[in-house]
UniProtKB/Swiss-Prot annotation:
<feature type="binding site">
    <location>
        <position position="53"/>
    </location>
    <ligand>
        <name>Mg(2+) 1</name>
    </ligand>
</feature>
<feature type="binding site">
    <location>
        <position position="73"/>
    </location>
    <ligand>
        <name>Mg(2+) 2</name>
    </ligand>
</feature>
<comment type="similarity">
    <text>Belongs to the Nudix hydrolase family.</text>
</comment>
<keyword id="KW-0378">Hydrolase</keyword>
<feature type="binding site">
    <location>
        <position position="118"/>
    </location>
    <ligand>
        <name>Mg(2+) 2</name>
    </ligand>
</feature>
<feature type="binding site">
    <location>
        <begin position="53"/>
        <end position="55"/>
    </location>
    <ligand>
        <name>substrate</name>
    </ligand>
</feature>
<feature type="binding site">
    <location>
        <position position="118"/>
    </location>
    <ligand>
        <name>Mg(2+) 1</name>
    </ligand>
</feature>
<protein>
    <recommendedName>
        <fullName>8-oxo-(d)GTP phosphatase</fullName>
        <ecNumber>3.6.1.69</ecNumber>
    </recommendedName>
</protein>
<dbReference type="InterPro" id="IPR000086">
    <property type="entry name" value="NUDIX_hydrolase_dom"/>
</dbReference>
<keyword id="KW-0235">DNA replication</keyword>
<feature type="short sequence motif" description="Nudix box">
    <location>
        <begin position="54"/>
        <end position="75"/>
    </location>
</feature>
<feature type="binding site">
    <location>
        <position position="118"/>
    </location>
    <ligand>
        <name>substrate</name>
    </ligand>
</feature>
<dbReference type="InterPro" id="IPR029033">
    <property type="entry name" value="His_PPase_superfam"/>
</dbReference>
<feature type="binding site">
    <location>
        <begin position="43"/>
        <end position="46"/>
    </location>
    <ligand>
        <name>substrate</name>
    </ligand>
</feature>
<keyword id="KW-0460">Magnesium</keyword>
<dbReference type="Pfam" id="PF00293">
    <property type="entry name" value="NUDIX"/>
</dbReference>
<dbReference type="GO" id="GO:0006281">
    <property type="term" value="P:DNA repair"/>
</dbReference>
Amino acid sequence: MSIQNSSARRRSAGRIVYAAGAVLWRPGSADSEGPVEIAVIHRPRYDDWSLPKGKVDPGETAPVGAVREILEETGHRANLGRRLLTVTYPTDSPFRGVKKVHYWAARSTGGEFTPGSEVDELIWLPVPDAMNKLDYAQDRKVLCRFAKHPADTQTVLVVRHGTAGSKAHFSGDDSKRPLDKRGRAQAEALVPQLLAFGATDVYAADRVRCHQTMEPLAAELNVTIHNEPTLTEESYANNPKRGRHRVLQIVEQVGTPVICTQGKVIPDLITWWCERDGVHPDKSRNRKGSTWVLSLSAGRLVTADHIGGALAANVRA
């Protein structure tokens, strides 16, 4: 299910409150009973044990909100991985409506818990013990989904470049057509969203608009954008096998690569990859500025999640 980002709105059935959370995990310790441990938090207001989550703030996308809430509730920084489930349940306060919570797997990259008024305890438990500790059926369902695949997956981020006006209205070499005002805003908004997944390296098809989409992220990471001639629409159409091979070469590198390319490349690339590895991808409209979050285990694709954009205030599934 693709996540489409939009401002929260009132509906006839009541308001939808958008939230985001995670199964926060870390490698198991030497005396742990499992390969990974799960963070379970206690909220004194409700006297319950749950997974970390919270409302998505205006101006945030769900992934950015998830990482912020993890830090606020647990004290841990985290990199998101595969999306798990979207949970919806009714809420009565301060208005009647529903809360919609998007959950991800999230690996702790360090931090230290400090008790507070909202969360006063955090415990790390193996998956079976965490399952027994959680008070809510929806949290246990999320954890079950997490346990379906190995925790430690590799993430690959495939981005369609931002908006760049109309080809018909650009008089120069189309390969040099730049981002327009909205496209530049998309490029800036992509930075926190891609960092939420632990982006480390940046690749862009040999088009000005692809490079410009990645420039803010590359500046934030202090890395060079790798130019990729085989991933332009023309080159990929002439030799898709060469383009796919180049993507697989990129994936072999250590880290979380971000690959920015064009609209006629991405659908074929995602379809080929999913068919090769037996994965059902999200449905998507392949909009400019959108992102595919691909999760791999032992070199094989296990999930293909889509995020519709990075600009809007909240999310709609």
